[in-house]
């Protein structure tokens, strides 16, 4: 019963575009055909970032039409954030597995069996400490790139998404450079900023 409640149609609908099209299924279809030599450089920032980017983009475009479907999408947004909190907290020895489960149940609204399975999946597989954070970091990078290039009219949605997938698994900063026609030099440095640099006290 918990599994049925936790995977109801409104929650499940919100994961379809992450896992299938335009998410991982489309991603894997394209990466098996274009520049396949790059697949060995795959990282969760690119793989999971792509799928989460679509969750964000479809929310922005009003994909969820009913209140129930909006709740389903927001549930997964909360879930992604909670994963970052409990994963990093566990690896920093700030939370136990049971506390991670309780967080998902009490703060996010997971069924307890589903929360237990989620925590087990996170800690008994090969996921690294930053795997869960990579979803959101990669997704936010792609979303920012979409705003820079598509929402300003420099590229169409179709050209933007096709180009990303056809480049296969490379760092998102490299995708950014290629799409913006920046020259890559040996000393090229990323200019992403996820924080504000402390002010100088000189």
List the predicted regions and their residue ranges:
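Long, His/Glu/Asp-enriched segments that create or flank divalent metal/ion-associated functional microenvironments
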Residues: 1-202
């Amino acid at each position: 019963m918990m599994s049925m409640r936790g995977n109801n149609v409104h929650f499940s609908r919100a994961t379809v575009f992450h896992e299938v099209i335009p998410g991982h299924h489309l991603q894997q279809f394209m990466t098996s055909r274009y520049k396949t030599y790059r697949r060995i450089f795959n990282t969760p920032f690119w793989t999971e970032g792509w799928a989460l980017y679509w969750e964000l983009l479809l929310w922005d475009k009003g994909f969820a039409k009913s209140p129930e479907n909006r709740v389903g999408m927001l549930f997964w947004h909360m879930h992604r954030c909670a994963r970052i909190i409990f994963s990093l907290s566990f690896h920093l020895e700030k939370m136990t597995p049971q506390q991670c489960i309780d967080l998902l149940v009490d703060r996010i609204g997971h069924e307890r069996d589903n929360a237990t399975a989620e925590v087990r999946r996170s800690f008994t597989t090969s996921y690294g400490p930053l795997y869960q954070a990579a979803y959101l970091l990669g997704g936010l990078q792609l979303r920012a790139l979409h705003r820079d290039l598509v929402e300003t009219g420099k590229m169409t949605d179709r050209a933007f998404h096709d180009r990303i997938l056809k480049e296969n698994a490379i760092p998102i900063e490299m995708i950014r450079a290629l799409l913006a026609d920046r020259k890559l030099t040996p000393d090229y440095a990323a200019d992403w900023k996820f924080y504000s640099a402390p002010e100088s006290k000189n």
